[in-house]
């Protein structure tokens, strides 16, 4: 318990967290790709944030 109070996790907990973060990052990456694909469609909320700056640059 002292290791957890000090903020130092045992190795097996770190491995579980890394594995979970990897799955979470893959899931977030997939969601990001879907959002980018959806931003190409005419939706004012998303296009205003993502493609608005790109159009101004061009």
Swiss-Prot record:
Task: Please give the GO cellular component terms listed in this UniProt entry.
Answer: membrane
Q: Which residues cross the membrane?
A: 17-37
- Its primary localisation, in coarse terms, equals membrane
UniProt name for this protein: Putative transcript Y 13 protein
Please give the organism: Homo sapiens (Human)
Q: Which UniProt keywords apply?
A: Membrane, Transmembrane, Transmembrane helix
The compartments listed are: Membrane
Gene symbol? TTTY13
Please report the record's description of how this protein sits within the membrane. Single-pass membrane protein
């Amino acid at each position: 318990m002292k290791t957890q109070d000090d903020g130092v996790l045992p190795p097996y907990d770190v491995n579980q967290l890394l594995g979970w973060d990897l799955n979470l990052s893959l899931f977030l990456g997939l969601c990001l790709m879907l959002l980018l694909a959806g931003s190409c469609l005419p939706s004012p909320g998303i296009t205003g944030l993502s493609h608005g700056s790109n159009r101004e640059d061009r």
